[in-house]
Structure formats: C-alpha cells, structure tokens
UniProtKB/Swiss-Prot annotation:
GO terms for biological process: chaeta development; neuron projection morphogenesis; positive regulation of axon extension; positive regulation of synaptic assembly at neuromuscular junction; postsynaptic actin cytoskeleton organization; regulation of actin filament polymerization; terminal button organization. This is Drebrin-like protein. The modification Phosphoserine is found at S242, S328. GO terms for molecular function: actin binding; actin filament binding; phosphatidylinositol-3,4,5-trisphosphate binding; phosphatidylinositol-4,5-bisphosphate binding; phosphatidylserine binding.
C-alpha cells in the first residue's frame, strides 16, 4: 500500500519548511507512521543537529528525517534525507515501506543526498560530511586566500641586440678554449690513471694466481714423485707432466682400460730395459776381451798420438824377440821308411838383435834432446788419450800371423830374418828423423805433438763410434701426423720425423726411438714403415 499524507500534510510541510529556512533555528525534523497504518506524521523537530536526532530515532520502527548540515569548507547548508529502517523493525513492515521513500522524497524535496541508515553509526556527522563532499562541488569560500601575488613587471621581451665586437672577443674565446683544453688534459690523465690502476690490479691478480699455481704444481710434483714406481725410466729427456694423470685422486679414478694400458706400458719398459742391459753387458764384455786379447797377442801400433818416441823404441826392443821364427815341430815318422828321430831345434835368437842395440842407443840419444824441449803437461794429455783407445779395433798381430803359418813357411822365414832386421833398422832411423822434424815444427807452431795427435785420435774415435752406433737403426718409420705424448711412457713427433729401433709390441701401439732421443710408445697408425 502507498503512503498517505492527507491527514497530516500541513504539519509535515511546516516542519519541512522550518528546516529549509536559513533564518530558523530548526535544523532537523523527524517523521513516522501512526500505529500500523501508512499515515505519515511529524514525530519531532529540533535545533541540536545530528547528535540530537540520534536520540529520537527508534530502532524498531520505519522513520524519515530531513536534516540541514553546514559545510565547513564552503559555509553553505547541505540538506539530507535519511531513510531510517531500524534493525528491530518487522521484516514485513520493511517490505511494505520499501517503496514509500520515493513518495516521501517527492514531498520533502530539496535534499542534496538521500541515504539509508539502520543504526546510529550510519548517522555519524563525519561520515555524512564525507558523503556530501563527494556529491557537491569542491568550493573553498571560507578558506583564507593566498598571499598577495608579487607585483609583476610590465610584459617585455628577451631580445637583446647583437654586438659583433662583444660576440667576437678573441680573448674570451682563447680563455674558453684554454679552459676546455685543460679540462680535456685532466680527463685524459684521469683516464690514464684509471687504466694504469686497472692494469696494475690485473697484473697483481695474475702474479698471485701464477704463484698459487706454481705452489700447487710443486705440491703435485712432490706427491707424484712419491707415487712413482722405483724402476729407472729408459727415457732421458724430460716430458711435460699431464695435469690429468698427476692429480692426487688419479689413482682412484683409473678405468679398466687405463689400468690395462699402464700394465702393458710397464711390461714393455721392463722388457726394453732387460734388452738394453743385456746389450750393454755384452758390449762391455766383448770390448774388455778384445782389449785383453790385443794386449796379449799383439804389439802396440806405432801411433804418435798414444806414446812418445822413446816409449815406442823401448816397446820395439822388448817385442823384438817375439818376431823370431818359431821352431818347426818334428815331422812324424813315415810307416814305410822309418827315420831316426831328431831332437827339436833350440830357439835361436834372431841375428837382427845385435845390430839393433847401437841403433836403439843412437835413437835414445837423439830423442833425449827432443824430450827435454817438450812440456811436462803433454804427459797427462797422452794419458787421457789412452782412455779413448779402448773402442779402437786392435791391429793384426804379428805373432798371430806367425802362429797361423805352416811349418814350411816358418823355415823359410828363418832364412829371410837377417834381411828383415836390416830393413827394420833403416825403418827405425827414418821414423826417428821424421819424428824429430815433426816435433820441431810443432814446437814452433805452439802446440805439442801429443796434443795434436790426441785431438786427431779423438776425432777418429768419435767418427768410429758414430759409425758403429748409426750402423744399425733397426726398423724405421716416418711420421704421417704429429703426436703429443700423453705421459712419460710415450714419445712426441711431428710429420716427417723418422722413428728408429721400432718394436711392434702390439697391433695398435709400437715402441721406438723418437727424433729427440726418447724411447717410448706411439700409435702405429700415425707412421708408415720405411723399407
């Protein structure tokens, strides 16, 4: 049902106008229903504002209020229409009066804002003012005006007349460019200083890093040396340590393939070491036996680099009886015609011994003068040169040749012994004269005969050793690719290098002597065999 204003319209309109009148003290009026009817009436009016209105509101009824509030910013009066629905009001009554607010707002016109309220908190003054500020313009009539604006000068222009003499002042320009140049120099110096400091910092970091790495490498080398086996490696040239295989935890991280490879390398090194040791022992044995046989069965060769002339003459006199003919053994008796057994002929000294004595005396007297002129320092040099003569092959022994002769040849040699002794006498005289001339010429040149002969023999011996060493290079191969040794058991080579003394110990890995003199393993598919 609709609301009814017929019975109390005059009182309602009078109360509404009192609130609208600015000269009236009444600033609020409250309206309600008579009993359970829809007839609207005036409940109360007052001038105490919103706080006084809250005292007359009943939480169990439906009521309407028209309020006047002064805006503190603008000083203007604002009017509110409040639709009060108490929390304790019957629900059916709320539904019935829900549509009455439209008719009431038409009667009580002039309100700036219509709000719904259910309790006293909804009618708080601050909340009402905040809602009014959102629906009204932001006026500030009562706010104090700002300070008096400063007096403004007459409107002018920024144009200034160009004065060429002032604009083109040379001194000002020079000062400007000098200032710019000084600033540029300062900037460059600051930039150089920053670069220098940065470079110094980088060098310091690099130096500290290198020192740290050097200490780590030393520790690594010490730990690796302790873990190395006790055998002596065949290779003599140093090989770079592999950082992967010298790590402290390398022994624990070996794979099966690496263990097999190391075992194979160890076995190959032991085999090569045994072969080299046996070869060295055999070479030493043969060399010592050859020297002993040469000393027992042969006379010393007449070499000026080894002995002095006086020593040669003494040896010649001592070995002269060895050149005597060997007595022929008795002939065996023939079974057909027996002959008397003849006693063996005694060993008769060669007739050349007697004439050799004056020759030796003459030679000794001649050599004595030469020996006095020679410095004493030549003797150690001759002794040192004797140490290198063991590698030389001893000359053919005369006694061996005599022993190999038949008895008939021995008999014929006895007949020619006298003639041979005379020829030896002449030969000795010739050698003495030549030696004296050589000693005098060497003395004038500033070098002794022993030094020259020792140097000549050393060169000859070195050539002989090189020929003996390079005579057998074994199986050779030429490198097709370059290879870098992974550890100390392998060799390094470049394309075109020749590898000698190759031992094909495995299908994929061979051993040989590299171009740098090291002996070790290398991959077989990196080389080709040289025929």
């Amino acid at each position: 049902m609709a609301v009814s204003f017929e019975k109390n319209r005059a009182q309602i309109v009078a109360a509404w106008k009192d609130v609208l009148d600015d000269k009236s003290d009444t600033n609020w009026s409250l309206f309600g229903y008579e009993g359970q009817t829809n007839e609207l009436k005036v409940v109360a009016t007052g001038d105490g504002g919103v706080d006084e209105l809250n005292e007359d509101l009943n939480s169990g009824k439906i009521m309407y209020a028209f309020v006047r509030i002064e805006d503190p910013k603008t000083g203007l009066n604002k009017y509110l229409l409040i639709n009060w629905q108490g929390e304790g009001a019957p629900v059916l009554r709320k539904g019935t009066c829900a549509n009455h607010i439209r008719d009431v707002s038409n009667l009580l016109s002039g309100a700036h804002l219509t709000i719904n309220a259910r309790n006293e908190d909804d009618i708080d003054l601050d909340r009402l003012l905040k809602k009014l500020s959102t629906v009204s313009s932001a006026y500030s009539f009562k706010e104090p005006r700002g300070a008096m604006e400063e007096q403004k000068a007459p409107v002018g222009t920024n144009y200034t007349r160009v004065i060429p003499t002032k604009e083109l002042n040379a001194s000002v320009m020079q000062d400007f460019w000098k200032k710019e140049e000084a600033e540029e120099k300062l900037r460059q110096e600051a930039e150089k200083e920053s670069k220098r400091l940065e470079l110094q910092k980088l060098e310091q970091e690099q130096r500290s890093r290198e020192e740290k790495e050097h200490k780590e490498r030393e520790k690594l080398v010490i730990s690796t040396t302790k873990l190395q086996p006790a055998h002596v490696p065949i290779k003599t040239s140093p090989q770079p340590l592999s950082p992967e295989k010298t790590a402290p935890g390398f022994a624990n991280n070996l794979t099966d393939a690496e263990r097999m490879r190391q075992a194979r390398n160890q076995e190959a090194r032991e085999l090569i070491g045994s072969r080299v040791g046996a070869a060295k022992a055999m070479f030493t044995k043969h060399t010592s036996e050859g020297q002993l046989q040469s000393k027992l069965n042969t006379q010393p060769p007449a070499k000026p680099a080894r002995n002095s002339i006086a020593q040669r003459i003494n040896v010649f006199n001592q070995n002269q009886p060895q050149d005597a003919p060997v007595p022929s053994p008795p002939r065996a008796a023939s079974p057909a015609k027996p002959l008397p057994v003849e006693a063996p002929e005694p060993v008769v000294p060669a007739p050349a011994i007697a004439p050799a004595a004056p020759v030796a005396a003459e030679v000794v007297s001649t050599i004595a003068e030469v020996e006095e002129s020679q410095p004493v320092d030549d003797l150690p040099l001759a002794h040192e040169s004797e140490q290198f003569s063991t590698i030389k092959r001893s000359p053919h022994s005369k006694s061996n040749s005599l022993q190999s002769q038949s008895p008939d040849e021995t008999t014929s040699s006895n007949e020619t012994d006298t003639a041979v002794s005379q020829e030896q006498e002449e030969e000795v005289r010739t050698k003495v004269s030549v030696t004296v001339q050589q000693s005098q010429s060497v003395k004038s040149s500033g070098m002794s005969t022993l030094e020259r002969n020792a140097l000549t023999d050393l060169v000859n011996e070195d050539d002989f050793i090189c020929q003996e060493t390079l005579g057998d290079l074994g199986q050779r191969a030429r490198a097709l690719y370059d290879y870098q040794a992974a550890d100390e058991t392998e060799i390094t080579f470049d394309p075109g290098d020749v590898i000698t003394h190759i031992d094909q110990i495995d299908e994929g890995w061979w051993q040989g002597l590299g171009p740098d003199g090291t002996y070790g393993l290398f991959p077989a598919n990196y080389v080709e065999i040289i025929n």
